Regions:
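Classical eukaryotic N-terminal signal peptides for Sec-dependent ER targeting/secretion
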Residues: 1-9
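Intrinsically disordered, low-complexity proline/glycine-rich segments
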Residues: 14-197
Length: 197
């Protein structure tokens, strides 16, 4: 018993250090339940104060499920994703436009099935990321696979009423991976029941 106490203390301090790290950017994702022009639903990505919509994620499903990320200011598609993720099959690829390099870069998302929950492995431009989520938690953390560097997290906000919109707080801790990667992952996890709606 006494041997496990120091281990628990170190583990608790480590978790608190991770949780206390300050984000460099924050967003609020708001799920829109209405359908428009062939899309199942949209998710608006707003600034942290919810005063300005920065991006829209538009999702459609058919034989191939699709998500497009639209820059709200320019109305340009800045990233797209396609594959199958709604049913048991999971196979997803995506492309993100890099304005500095003036080119599209591809990536993949794979599901890692667990007994009580699923995690995801993301590959993008030689970056390998994983998610960490417990079955009882509405918080998802993303980190580098190799060195466990903490990159981002998102969590669902508590709703007082069922008719109020589903909202997620997104916190970004690094510029090493485009924010679109996190937006895509959030959208897929939302489709697969993260908000349980």
């Amino acid at each position: 018993m006494l041997k496990t106490l120091p281990t628990l203390l170190v583990f608790t301090i480590f978790i608190k250090c991770i949780d206390s790290k300050e984000p460099i950017r924050s967003y609020v994702a708001i799920k829109n339940k209405t359908t428009t022009k062939g899309f199942i639903h949209e998710i608006a990505i707003c600034d942290s104060q919810e005063k300005k919509i920065l991006y829209r994620l538009k999702t459609s499903t058919s034989d191939i499920d699709t998500i497009i990320l639209v820059d709200q200011q320019t109305k340009n598609i800045v990233a797209n994703l396609e594959g199958i993720w709604v049913d048991g099959t999971f196979n997803v690829t995506f492309s993100i436009y890099d304005t500095k390099l003036n080119k599209w870069t591809d990536g993949t998302i794979k599901r890692i099935a667990r007994v009580a929950d699923d995690d995801y492995a993301i590959k993008y431009n030689n970056h390998h990321l994983n998610t960490d989520r417990r079955w009882y938690s509405k918080k998802v953390k993303l980190y580098y696979t190799t060195n466990k560097e903490y990159l981002a997290r998102f969590r669902i906000r508590y709703r007082w009423f069922n008719w109020s919109p589903i909202k997620y707080d997104i916190q970004i801790y690094s510029n090493k991976v485009p924010d679109a990667v996190y937006f895509f992952l959030l959208t897929i996890m939302e489709h697969r029941g993260l908000s349980e709606e």
